[in-house]
Protein backbone atom coordinates (compact mmCIF):
# COMPACT_ATOMS: atom_id res chain seq x y z
CA UNK A 1 0.00 0.00 0.00
CA UNK A 2 1.39 3.38 -0.93
CA UNK A 3 1.90 5.97 1.78
CA UNK A 4 -0.56 8.86 1.97
CA UNK A 5 1.01 12.31 1.61
CA UNK A 6 0.24 14.46 4.64
CA UNK A 7 0.96 18.13 3.90
CA UNK A 8 2.63 20.25 6.53
CA UNK A 9 0.05 22.04 8.68
CA UNK A 10 1.57 25.46 8.04
CA UNK A 11 1.66 24.87 4.28
CA UNK A 12 -1.95 23.73 4.40
CA UNK A 13 -2.98 26.87 6.28
CA UNK A 14 -1.22 29.03 3.69
CA UNK A 15 -3.01 27.21 0.89
CA UNK A 16 -6.35 27.69 2.63
CA UNK A 17 -5.61 31.39 3.08
CA UNK A 18 -4.91 31.77 -0.64
CA UNK A 19 -8.11 29.89 -1.45
CA UNK A 20 -10.08 32.15 0.90
CA UNK A 21 -8.59 35.21 -0.81
CA UNK A 22 -9.61 34.19 -4.34
CA UNK A 23 -13.13 35.71 -4.43
CA UNK A 24 -11.80 38.98 -3.00
CA UNK A 25 -9.01 39.12 -5.58
CA UNK A 26 -11.56 38.58 -8.34
CA UNK A 27 -13.88 41.22 -6.88
CA UNK A 28 -11.24 43.96 -6.61
CA UNK A 29 -9.18 43.38 -9.77
CA UNK A 30 -8.93 46.66 -11.69
CA UNK A 31 -10.20 48.74 -8.75
CA UNK A 32 -8.42 51.69 -7.13
CA UNK A 33 -7.50 51.58 -3.45
CA UNK A 34 -6.31 54.72 -1.65
CA UNK A 35 -4.09 53.98 1.34
CA UNK A 36 -3.15 56.65 3.88
CA UNK A 37 0.19 55.63 5.35
CA UNK A 38 1.57 57.07 8.57
CA UNK A 39 2.23 56.53 12.25
CA UNK A 40 4.34 53.64 13.54
CA UNK A 41 4.32 51.87 10.19
CA UNK A 42 6.23 54.77 8.67
CA UNK A 43 8.94 55.00 11.33
CA UNK A 44 9.79 51.32 11.74
CA UNK A 45 11.94 49.67 9.01
CA UNK A 46 10.33 46.24 9.43
CA UNK A 47 6.84 47.73 9.30
CA UNK A 48 7.82 49.87 6.30
CA UNK A 49 9.04 46.78 4.46
CA UNK A 50 5.82 44.88 5.27
CA UNK A 51 3.76 47.82 4.04
CA UNK A 52 5.72 48.09 0.79
CA UNK A 53 5.37 44.36 0.15
CA UNK A 54 1.61 44.58 0.69
CA UNK A 55 1.31 47.47 -1.77
CA UNK A 56 3.39 45.66 -4.40
CA UNK A 57 1.30 42.52 -3.95
CA UNK A 58 -1.92 44.48 -4.49
CA UNK A 59 -0.52 45.84 -7.74
CA UNK A 60 0.64 42.38 -8.83
CA UNK A 61 -2.88 40.92 -8.52
CA UNK A 62 -4.48 43.69 -10.55
CA UNK A 63 -5.50 46.22 -7.89
CA UNK A 64 -4.34 49.84 -8.34
CA UNK A 65 -3.04 51.17 -4.99
CA UNK A 66 -2.51 54.91 -4.50
CA UNK A 67 -0.48 55.79 -1.40
CA UNK A 68 -0.97 59.06 0.50
CA UNK A 69 1.43 59.74 3.36
CA UNK A 70 1.61 62.02 6.35
CA UNK A 71 4.65 63.46 8.08
CA UNK A 72 3.68 65.77 10.94
CA UNK A 73 6.28 64.46 13.44
CA UNK A 74 9.05 64.61 10.84
CA UNK A 75 8.12 68.19 9.97
CA UNK A 76 8.22 69.09 13.66
CA UNK A 77 11.70 67.57 14.02
CA UNK A 78 13.01 69.47 11.00
CA UNK A 79 11.56 72.77 12.21
CA UNK A 80 13.24 72.22 15.57
CA UNK A 81 16.55 71.28 13.93
CA UNK A 82 16.44 74.48 11.87
CA UNK A 83 15.54 76.60 14.88
CA UNK A 84 12.10 77.54 13.58
CA UNK A 85 9.54 77.90 16.36
CA UNK A 86 6.07 76.55 15.65
CA UNK A 87 2.99 78.52 16.61
CA UNK A 88 -0.18 76.64 17.48
CA UNK A 89 -3.75 77.91 17.74
CA UNK A 90 -6.25 75.55 19.35
CA UNK A 91 -3.84 72.69 18.70
CA UNK A 92 -3.41 73.50 15.00
CA UNK A 93 -0.01 74.45 13.62
CA UNK A 94 0.16 77.88 11.99
CA UNK A 95 1.91 77.39 8.65
CA UNK A 96 3.63 80.60 7.59
CA UNK A 97 5.60 80.87 4.35
CA UNK A 98 8.85 79.57 5.89
CA UNK A 99 7.11 76.66 7.59
CA UNK A 100 5.28 75.78 4.37
CA UNK A 101 8.55 75.56 2.45
CA UNK A 102 10.15 73.36 5.11
CA UNK A 103 7.06 71.14 5.23
CA UNK A 104 7.15 70.67 1.46
CA UNK A 105 10.86 69.85 1.63
CA UNK A 106 10.24 67.15 4.25
CA UNK A 107 7.09 65.72 2.69
CA UNK A 108 8.01 65.75 -0.99
CA UNK A 109 11.78 65.58 -0.73
CA UNK A 110 12.38 63.12 2.10
CA UNK A 111 9.38 61.07 3.22
CA UNK A 112 7.89 60.67 -0.24
CA UNK A 113 11.13 59.40 -1.76
CA UNK A 114 11.74 57.04 1.15
CA UNK A 115 8.39 55.37 0.48
CA UNK A 116 9.16 55.19 -3.24
CA UNK A 117 12.44 53.47 -2.36
CA UNK A 118 10.76 50.95 -0.05
CA UNK A 119 8.28 50.01 -2.77
CA UNK A 120 11.13 49.74 -5.26
CA UNK A 121 13.03 47.36 -3.00
CA UNK A 122 9.89 45.24 -2.74
CA UNK A 123 9.81 44.92 -6.52
CA UNK A 124 7.30 47.63 -7.38
CA UNK A 125 7.52 50.70 -9.63
CA UNK A 126 6.51 53.76 -7.65
CA UNK A 127 6.41 57.44 -8.60
CA UNK A 128 6.51 60.19 -5.99
CA UNK A 129 4.28 63.20 -6.60
CA UNK A 130 2.30 65.79 -4.66
CA UNK A 131 -1.09 67.34 -5.16
CA UNK A 132 0.63 70.23 -6.92
CA UNK A 133 1.73 68.07 -9.85
CA UNK A 134 -0.55 68.57 -12.85
CA UNK A 135 -2.89 70.36 -10.42
CA UNK A 136 -3.89 66.97 -9.06
CA UNK A 137 -5.49 68.53 -5.97
CA UNK A 138 -6.69 72.12 -5.87
CA UNK A 139 -7.44 73.59 -2.48
CA UNK A 140 -9.02 76.50 -0.73
CA UNK A 141 -7.54 78.10 2.34
CA UNK A 142 -8.82 76.62 5.59
CA UNK A 143 -10.85 79.12 7.58
CA UNK A 144 -11.20 78.60 11.29
CA UNK A 145 -13.60 80.56 13.47
CA UNK A 146 -13.51 80.64 17.25
CA UNK A 147 -15.16 82.63 20.02
CA UNK A 148 -13.21 85.61 21.26
CA UNK A 149 -12.34 85.05 24.91
CA UNK A 150 -13.00 88.70 25.71
CA UNK A 151 -16.43 89.42 24.23
CA UNK A 152 -17.57 86.01 22.98
CA UNK A 153 -17.83 87.22 19.39
CA UNK A 154 -16.73 85.06 16.45
CA UNK A 155 -13.24 85.81 15.17
CA UNK A 156 -11.40 84.48 12.13
CA UNK A 157 -8.16 82.62 12.81
CA UNK A 158 -5.47 82.66 10.13
CA UNK A 159 -3.66 79.31 10.04
CA UNK A 160 -1.51 80.38 7.11
CA UNK A 161 -0.89 78.01 4.22
CA UNK A 162 -3.24 75.23 5.29
CA UNK A 163 -5.67 74.05 2.65
CA UNK A 164 -8.76 71.93 2.13
CA UNK A 165 -9.21 69.97 -1.13
CA UNK A 166 -11.96 71.29 -3.38
CA UNK A 167 -11.23 69.42 -6.62
CA UNK A 168 -9.27 66.42 -7.89
CA UNK A 169 -8.02 66.07 -11.48
CA UNK A 170 -7.56 62.33 -11.79
CA UNK A 171 -5.83 62.26 -15.18
CA UNK A 172 -2.29 62.10 -13.80
CA UNK A 173 -3.15 59.25 -11.41
CA UNK A 174 -4.94 57.33 -14.18
CA UNK A 175 -1.94 57.71 -16.49
CA UNK A 176 0.42 56.40 -13.82
CA UNK A 177 -1.72 53.46 -12.70
CA UNK A 178 -2.45 52.37 -16.26
CA UNK A 179 1.30 52.41 -16.93
CA UNK A 180 1.93 49.95 -14.11
CA UNK A 181 3.10 52.61 -11.65
CA UNK A 182 2.19 53.04 -8.00
CA UNK A 183 1.57 56.74 -7.19
CA UNK A 184 2.89 57.95 -3.84
CA UNK A 185 1.28 61.31 -3.04
CA UNK A 186 2.51 63.96 -0.60
CA UNK A 187 -0.33 65.92 1.10
CA UNK A 188 0.34 69.23 -0.60
CA UNK A 189 -1.99 71.09 -2.95
CA UNK A 190 -2.20 74.27 -4.95
CA UNK A 191 -4.63 77.12 -4.43
CA UNK A 192 -6.37 79.30 -7.01
CA UNK A 193 -3.77 81.92 -6.08
CA UNK A 194 -0.98 79.57 -7.19
CA UNK A 195 0.33 79.22 -3.65
CA UNK A 196 1.35 75.95 -2.01
CA UNK A 197 -0.83 74.66 0.84
CA UNK A 198 -0.36 71.83 3.31
CA UNK A 199 -3.27 69.41 3.65
CA UNK A 200 -4.12 67.06 6.48
CA UNK A 201 -3.08 63.62 5.18
CA UNK A 202 -6.34 61.89 6.16
CA UNK A 203 -8.32 64.63 4.45
CA UNK A 204 -6.10 64.37 1.37
CA UNK A 205 -6.60 60.60 1.20
CA UNK A 206 -10.36 60.95 1.54
CA UNK A 207 -10.54 63.57 -1.22
CA UNK A 208 -8.44 61.43 -3.55
CA UNK A 209 -10.53 58.34 -2.81
CA UNK A 210 -13.68 60.24 -3.75
CA UNK A 211 -12.13 61.90 -6.80
CA UNK A 212 -10.70 58.61 -8.08
CA UNK A 213 -13.93 56.69 -7.41
CA UNK A 214 -11.93 54.26 -5.30
CA UNK A 215 -13.34 50.96 -4.11
CA UNK A 216 -11.61 51.32 -0.75
CA UNK A 217 -10.06 53.98 1.46
CA UNK A 218 -7.65 52.71 4.12
CA UNK A 219 -6.48 54.90 6.99
CA UNK A 220 -3.53 53.29 8.78
CA UNK A 221 -3.34 54.34 12.43
CA UNK A 222 -1.63 53.35 15.67
CA UNK A 223 -4.77 51.81 17.18
CA UNK A 224 -6.67 48.60 16.42
CA UNK A 225 -9.59 50.52 14.93
CA UNK A 226 -12.74 51.92 16.52
CA UNK A 227 -13.44 50.44 19.95
CA UNK A 228 -16.75 50.14 21.77
CA UNK A 229 -17.39 51.08 25.40
CA UNK A 230 -15.82 47.79 26.51
CA UNK A 231 -12.71 48.46 24.42
CA UNK A 232 -13.60 45.75 21.92
CA UNK A 233 -13.03 46.27 18.21
CA UNK A 234 -16.09 47.28 16.20
CA UNK A 235 -15.85 45.45 12.87
CA UNK A 236 -18.35 47.59 10.94
CA UNK A 237 -19.94 50.99 11.43
CA UNK A 238 -22.43 53.17 9.58
CA UNK A 239 -22.71 56.97 9.73
CA UNK A 240 -25.75 56.77 12.03
CA UNK A 241 -23.94 54.42 14.41
CA UNK A 242 -20.90 56.69 14.42
CA UNK A 243 -23.13 59.64 15.28
CA UNK A 244 -24.68 57.76 18.21
CA UNK A 245 -21.32 56.57 19.55
CA UNK A 246 -19.87 60.07 19.26
CA UNK A 247 -22.78 61.59 21.18
CA UNK A 248 -22.23 58.93 23.86
CA UNK A 249 -18.51 59.85 24.06
CA UNK A 250 -17.52 56.31 23.06
CA UNK A 251 -15.83 57.83 20.02
CA UNK A 252 -13.71 60.86 20.92
CA UNK A 253 -10.48 62.74 20.31
CA UNK A 254 -8.48 62.14 17.15
CA UNK A 255 -10.76 59.33 16.02
CA UNK A 256 -13.57 61.80 15.30
CA UNK A 257 -11.92 63.57 12.32
CA UNK A 258 -10.76 60.21 10.92
CA UNK A 259 -14.31 58.90 10.96
CA UNK A 260 -15.58 62.16 9.47
CA UNK A 261 -13.18 61.55 6.57
CA UNK A 262 -14.51 57.99 6.23
CA UNK A 263 -18.12 59.18 6.21
CA UNK A 264 -17.43 61.89 3.63
CA UNK A 265 -15.68 59.39 1.37
CA UNK A 266 -18.45 56.76 1.41
CA UNK A 267 -21.08 59.45 0.89
CA UNK A 268 -19.04 60.59 -2.12
CA UNK A 269 -19.14 57.15 -3.75
CA UNK A 270 -16.29 55.17 -2.18
CA UNK A 271 -17.57 51.63 -1.52
CA UNK A 272 -16.14 51.48 2.00
CA UNK A 273 -13.50 53.06 4.23
CA UNK A 274 -11.41 51.14 6.73
CA UNK A 275 -9.49 52.27 9.82
CA UNK A 276 -6.61 49.83 10.31
CA UNK A 277 -3.81 49.25 12.79
CA UNK A 278 -0.62 49.97 10.86
CA UNK A 279 1.41 48.31 13.61
CA UNK A 280 0.05 44.88 12.66
CA UNK A 281 2.13 43.20 9.93
CA UNK A 282 0.22 42.87 6.64
CA UNK A 283 -2.94 44.35 8.14
CA UNK A 284 -4.12 45.50 4.70
CA UNK A 285 -3.97 41.95 3.34
CA UNK A 286 -5.71 40.53 6.40
CA UNK A 287 -8.49 43.10 6.08
CA UNK A 288 -8.96 42.53 2.37
CA UNK A 289 -8.55 38.83 1.89
CA UNK A 290 -10.03 37.21 5.00
CA UNK A 291 -13.62 36.99 6.16
CA UNK A 292 -12.80 38.32 9.62
CA UNK A 293 -10.87 41.38 8.48
CA UNK A 294 -8.51 43.41 10.64
CA UNK A 295 -9.98 46.84 11.34
CA UNK A 296 -13.19 48.88 11.40
CA UNK A 297 -15.05 49.12 8.10
CA UNK A 298 -17.29 52.15 7.51
CA UNK A 299 -20.10 51.83 4.99
CA UNK A 300 -23.39 53.59 4.30
CA UNK A 301 -26.49 52.75 6.35
Swiss-Prot record:
InterPro entries found in the cross-reference section: AceGlu_kinase-like_sf, AcgluKinase_fam, ArgB, Asp/Glu/Uridylate_kinase, Glu/AcGlu_kinase, NAGK-C
One GO process term, biological-process aspect: arginine biosynthetic process via ornithine
Cell location: Cytoplasm
Enzyme class per UniProt: transferase
Keyword Cytoplasm among record annotations: yes
Catalytic activity entry: N-acetyl-L-glutamate + ATP = N-acetyl-L-glutamyl 5-phosphate + ADP
Any one GO molecular function term: acetylglutamate kinase activity
This protein's pathway: Amino-acid biosynthesis; L-arginine biosynthesis; N(2)-acetyl-L-ornithine from L-glutamate: step 2/4
Coarse class of the protein's main subcellular location: cytoplasm
Record keywords: Amino-acid biosynthesis, Arginine biosynthesis, ATP-binding, Cytoplasm, Kinase, Nucleotide-binding, Transferase
EC number: 2.7.2.8
GO CC field: cytoplasm
Annotated site residues (Transition state stabilizer) in this chain: 36, 258
Role this protein plays: Catalyzes the ATP-dependent phosphorylation of N-acetyl-L-glutamate.
HAMAP family: ArgB (MF_00082)
PANTHER family, per database record: N-ACETYLGLUTAMATE SYNTHASE, N-ACETYLGLUTAMATE SYNTHASE, MITOCHONDRIAL
Protein name per the record: Acetylglutamate kinase
Organism taxonomic ancestry: Bacteria, Pseudomonadati, Pseudomonadota, Alphaproteobacteria, Sphingomonadales
Name of the gene encoding the protein in the UniProt record: argB
Amino acid sequence: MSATYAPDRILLEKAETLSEALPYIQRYAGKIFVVKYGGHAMGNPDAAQDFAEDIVLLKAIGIHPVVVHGGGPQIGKMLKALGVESQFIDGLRVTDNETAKIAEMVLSGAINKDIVSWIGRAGGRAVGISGKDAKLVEVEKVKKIRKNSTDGQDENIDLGFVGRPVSVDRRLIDTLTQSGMIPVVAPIGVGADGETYNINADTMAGALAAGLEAARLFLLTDVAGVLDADKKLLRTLTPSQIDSLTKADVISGGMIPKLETCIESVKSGVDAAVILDGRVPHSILIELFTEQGAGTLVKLD
